[in-house]
């Protein structure tokens, strides 16, 4: 079975979602199905069919989260000695060599990536170029819009 890296924050978010789905949503859907059943003929009961469909989606999401958690390797970057090298979970400030524009990214697991929040997937072109490099290094990133050079300004374990 393939294991996937996940940050502590990513694991916590999945656990919270799983708890919400199993403790709040699942019981409410069961209650909704019971209430809809009482309305009569199930063949033409839109409320019943909608609740059953939603129940199926919730159960699929629960299975998905449980599978992800089972195959996750949770990495707490704050427990790893700071060497100045970029590793999974670190937060990296980089500057475009040509424009001097800087940006900060945290390198996270595939499921945690959210570019709007500054979280990039470990499998993204930028992250792949940054991994194992050090502060002061210049990396070349091949993107759909062309080749960009970035200098690593700072690596933080937060």
Curated annotation (Swiss-Prot):
GO molecular function: DNA binding; RNA polymerase binding
InterPro entries: GreA/GreB_C_sf, TF_GreA/GreB_CS, Tscrpt_elong_fac_GreA, Tscrpt_elong_fac_GreA/B, Tscrpt_elong_fac_GreA/B_C, Tscrpt_elong_fac_GreA/B_fam, Tscrpt_elong_fac_GreA/B_N, Tscrpt_elong_fac_GreA/B_N_sf
Record SUPFAM superfamilies: FKBP-like (SSF54534), GreA transcript cleavage protein, N-terminal domain (SSF46557)
GO terms classed as biological process: DNA-templated transcription elongation; regulation of DNA-templated transcription elongation
Keyword DNA-binding set for record: yes
One Pfam family cited in the UniProt record for this chain: GreA_GreB_N
The UniProt record lists the keyword Ribonucleoprotein: no
Record's keyword terms, sorted: DNA-binding, Transcription, Transcription regulation
Gene3D superfamilies referenced in this protein's UniProt entry, alphabetically: Transcription elongation factor, GreA/GreB, C-terminal domain (3.10.50.30), Transcription elongation factor, GreA/GreB, N-terminal domain (1.10.287.180)
PANTHER family in the cross-refs: TRANSCRIPTION ELONGATION FACTOR GREA
Role this protein plays: Necessary for efficient RNA polymerase transcription elongation past template-encoded arresting sites. The arresting sites in DNA have the property of trapping a certain fraction of elongating RNA polymerases that pass through, resulting in locked ternary complexes. Cleavage of the nascent transcript by cleavage factors such as GreA or GreB allows the resumption of elongation from the new 3'terminus. GreA releases sequences of 2 to 3 nucleotides.
Family the UniProt entry places it in: Belongs to the GreA/GreB family.
Cited NCBIfam families: greA, PRK00226.1-2, PRK00226.1-4, PRK00226.1-5
Protein name (Swiss-Prot/TrEMBL): Transcription elongation factor GreA
Organism: Pseudomonas syringae pv. tomato (strain ATCC BAA-871 / DC3000)
């Amino acid at each position: 079975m393939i294991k996937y890296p996940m940050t502590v924050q990513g694991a916590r978010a999945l656990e919270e979602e799983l708890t919400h789905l199993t403790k709040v949503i699942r019981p409410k859907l069961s209650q909704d199905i019971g209430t809809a059943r009482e309305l009569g003929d199930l063949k033409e009961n839109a409320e019943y069919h909608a609740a059953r469909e939603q129940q199926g989606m919730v159960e699929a999401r629960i299975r998905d989260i449980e599978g992800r958690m089972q195959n996750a390797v949770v990495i707490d970057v704050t427990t790893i000695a700071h060497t100045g090298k970029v590793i999974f979970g670190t937060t990296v400030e980089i500057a475009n060599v040509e424009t001097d524009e800087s940006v900060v990214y945290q390198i996270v697991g595939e499921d945690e990536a959210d570019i709007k929040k500054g979280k990039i997937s470990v499998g993204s072109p930028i992250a792949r170029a940054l991994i194992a490099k050090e502060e002061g290094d210049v990396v070349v990133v091949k993107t759909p819009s062309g080749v960009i050079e970035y200098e690593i300004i700072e690596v933080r374990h937060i």
